[in-house]
Swiss-Prot record:
Provenance organism: Mus musculus
Domain of life: Eukaryota
NCBIfam families linked: PRK00290.1, PRK05183.1, prok_dnaK
Enzyme class, broadest EC rank: hydrolase
Transit peptide: 1-46
SUPFAM superfamilies in UniProt: Actin-like ATPase domain, Heat shock protein 70kD (HSP70), peptide-binding domain
Any one Gene Ontology cellular component term annotated for this protein: myelin sheath
Subunit and interaction comment: Interacts strongly with the intermediate form of FXN and weakly with its mature form. Interacts with HSCB. Associates with the mitochondrial contact site and cristae organizing system (MICOS) complex, composed of at least MICOS10/MIC10, CHCHD3/MIC19, CHCHD6/MIC25, APOOL/MIC27, IMMT/MIC60, APOO/MIC23/MIC26 and QIL1/MIC13. This complex was also known under the names MINOS or MitOS complex. The MICOS complex associates with mitochondrial outer membrane proteins SAMM50, MTX1, MTX2 and DNAJC11, mitochondrial inner membrane protein TMEM11 and with HSPA9.
Region: Substrate-binding domain (SBD), residue numbers: 442-679
Gene: Hspa9
Residue numbers carrying N6-succinyllysine: 135, 138, 206, 300, 360, 368, 394, 567, 600, 610, 646
Positions of region (Interdomain linker): 432-441
The protein's name: Stress-70 protein, mitochondrial
Length: 679
């Protein structure tokens, strides 16, 4: 036996026994794509079991989210309850426990910064100790904490929430938007993720979908979705680059489009680079200038910082279309000398200088993606811009310099990803039949072998789904178990890469080192999620896992979060019922009082007084509406309405009889007149 640490180091004894459909495949197929590969991919895409109902496409963004559905052969972006086509990915919890999502949450962020969560997609699937998370803790007003499993979670009013839960609350809002449009329950969804997301982040996104009550049919990469949106109605074959600089992440993908086949050649990116970093850089500049001018440091004042953050975002957007903007924040803070106001002019050139390093960080991934795809910039027929930050003129100029051509404006940078997700949903549902999507895994996968070396089994930019096996052996005499450590990344040593998970194959018969044959198989599904198995070829003993890191959400965690989400959904339903009942009651009170004033001469005084008492009771009930159910308010309002109807019926009868009486006397006078005329 050897120590546990060395048990992790299985020794490589053989070459790869490839099971990959990409390996040794005949090249005589359609458009250079083998028939075997076509069958392998399409078998998963065109599932035999029929998908019932519409499949919604959701772009779960860092800053904003968007939802679309297929209508015939066209994808339609849906408007939310506020009438907007995108929804802020913001979730807030008020002091009384109410949960707000989208624009209502964003509007109250200034007065409730500590309990308003934004850009939590940057935390999804990440460990608390990750350098990026530690950097983020200094930049946000809310609390990022270490969960019991070591992941980064957030805290509001003493309650902990996983980033998957926060994502689920946003997804529930998108689901509700789709259901309002469709008129029925939306169950199936395709959700997008940044192309450079690792396995943990993809799994956490899928968990968010499950928590929200969605059946996530597929997780697809954002640039690939944008390419679908761009190329669905295009007939010419070409190589395109998708430059996706969004709110929190950056991706670059090189794709080849041929007769409805969208094949990703390579992908690269940075999962911690986006509009949030541009906002943060500008915020730091404003705070620094304000301190230089007034001597007041705003960094300890969360409410003031939130106002500056919102002003920075607004200024950033304005400078995409104008060369100068004013930042005015009256009564931002105060000191012993009185209130302090912020008044600042900011030019586009100044802003570009502040964020130039961030823009430069997108260049190396683009060059690497072209290198991996084995294309030069002259081979690229179109450059597609995706993500709100690509509206910035300096970003567009950088892209033009990098690829040697002006970028295309053929797609809406805010909506293209959701449209592409809806198209993929149409493919899975069988409604779109002339599209085939061949995506890739963004990072290499392998295991830790003797000496802590990272041995790759599947290289980055391998077309998925894919499967590959390799034979390893024991590192010590008499070893009866092997611990398999599964890693993802590009570094030579396993410890420098992302540890996705680990498991142990036990029951290996004692033998000299190098004799047992342990076959490790990696299977990456069409979602980019990894499944691993290890098999002792001598005994046939096998151990299989779907990779779940030491962090991540357990099945019980997800079930509890689903219940909590359902509880919130039920609370939202009750709240909506109560609001509707209150509106109805207030309308009845207003109508009743108006009619009482109008018909006061026809109404008996005692009956009027009784009705006024009913109205007073109704008003008292509405004063304590937060503790009442919608049903109680509705019943009380209905009783008031019935009482008022009876009273007004009496008034109507009285008026009718009066008119009848006056009408009779009028008829008699007319007869007398006629009689006189005849004489």
């Amino acid at each position: 036996m050897i120590s546990a640490s060395r048990a992790a180091a299985a020794r490589l004894v053989g070459t790869a026994a490839s099971r990959s459909p990409a390996a040794a495949r005949p090249q005589d197929g359609w458009n250079g794509l083998s028939h075997e590969a076509f069958r392998f991919v399409s078998r998963r895409d065109y599932a035999s079991e029929a998908i019932k109902g519409a499949v919604v496409g959701i772009d779960l963004g860092t800053t904003n989210s968007c939802v679309a559905v297929m209508e015939g052969k066209q994808a339609k972006v849906l408007e939310n309850a506020e009438g907007a086509r995108t929804t802020p990915s913001v979730v807030a919890f008020t002091a009384d426990g109410e949960r707000l999502v989208g624009m209502p949450a964003k509007r109250q962020a200034v007065t409730n910064p500590n309990n308003t969560f934004y850009a939590t997609k940057r935390l999804i699937g990440r460990r608390y100790d990750d350098p990026e998370v530690q950097k983020d803790t200094k930049n946000v007003p809310f609390k990022i904490v270490r969960a019991s499993n070591g992941d980064a979670w957030v805290e509001a009013h003493g309650k902990l929430y996983s980033p998957s839960q926060i994502g689920a609350f946003v997804l529930m809002k998108m689901k509700e938007t789709a259901e309002n449009y469709l008129g029925h329950t939306a169950k199936n969804a395709v959700i997008t993720v940044p192309a450079y997301f690792n396995d943990s982040q993809r799994q956490a996104t899928k968990d968010a979908g499950q928590i929200s009550g969605l059946n996530v049919l597929r997780v697809i990469n954002e640039p690939t979705a944008a390419a679908l949106a761009y190329g669905l109605d295009k007939s010419e074959d070409k190589v395109i680059a998708v430059y996706d600089l969004g709110g929190g992440t950056f991706d670059i993908s090189i794709l080849e489009i041929q007769k409805g086949v969208f094949e990703v050649k390579s992908t690269n990116g940075d999962t911690f680079l986006g509009g949030e970093d541009f906002d943060q850089a500008l915020l730091r500049h404003i705070v620094k200038e304000f301190k230089r001018e007034t001597g007041v440091d705003l960094t300890k004042d969360n409410m003031a910082l939130q106002r500056v953050r919102e002003a920075a975002e607004k200024a950033k957007c304005e400078l995409s279309s104008s060369v100068q903007t004013d930042i005015n924040l009256p009564y931002l803070t105060m000191d012993a000398s009185g209130p302090k106001h912020l008044n600042m002019k900011l030019t586009r050139a100044q802003f570009e200088g502040i964020v130039t390093d961030l823009i430069k960080r997108t260049i190396a991934p683009c060059q690497k993606a072209m290198q991996d795809a084995e294309v030069s910039k002259s081979d690229i027929g179109e450059v597609i811009l995706v993500g709100g930050m690509t509206r910035m003129p300096k970003v567009q100029q950088t892209v033009q310099d990098l690829f040697g051509r002006a970028p295309s404006k053929a797609v809406n940078p805010d909506e293209a990803v959701a449209i592409g997700a809806a198209i993929q949903g149409g493919v899975l549902a069988g409604d779109v039949t002339d599209v085939l999507l061949l995506d890739v895994t963004p990072l290499s996968l392998g295991i830790e072998t003797l000496g802590g070396v990272f041995t790759k089994l599947i290289n980055r930019n391998t077309t998925i789904p894919t499967k590959k096996s390799q034979v390893f052996s024991t590192a010590a005499d008499g070893q009866t178990q092997v611990e398999i450590k599964v890693c993802q990344g590009e570094r030579e040593m396993a410890g420098d890469n992302k540890l996705l998970g680990q498991f142990t194959l036990i029951g290996i018969p004692p033998a000299p080192r190098g004799v047992p044959q342990i076959e490790v198989t990696f299977d990456i599904d069409a979602n980019g999620i990894v499944h691993v198995s290890a098999k002792d070829k001598g005994t046939g003993r096998e151990q299989q896992i779907v990779i779940q890191s030491s962090g991540g959400l357990s099945k019980d965690d997800i079930e509890n979060m689903v219940k909590n989400a359902e509880k919130y959904a039920e609370e939202d339903r009750r709240k909506k019922e109560r609001v509707e009942a209150v509106n109805m009651a207030e309308g009845i009170i207003h109508d009743t009082e108006t009619k009482m004033e109008e018909f006061k001469d026809q109404l008996p005084a005692d009956e009027c007084n009784k009705l006024k008492e009913e109205i007073s009771k109704m008003r008292a009930l509405l004063a304590g509406k937060d503790s009442e159910t919608g049903e109680n308010i509705r019943q009380a309002a209905s009783s008031l309405q019935q009482a008022s109807l009876k009273l007004f019926e009496m008034a109507y009868k009285k008026m009718a009889s009066e008119r009848e009486g006056s009408g009779s006397s009028g008829t008699g006078e007319q007869k007398e007149d006629q009689k006189e005329e005849k004489q």
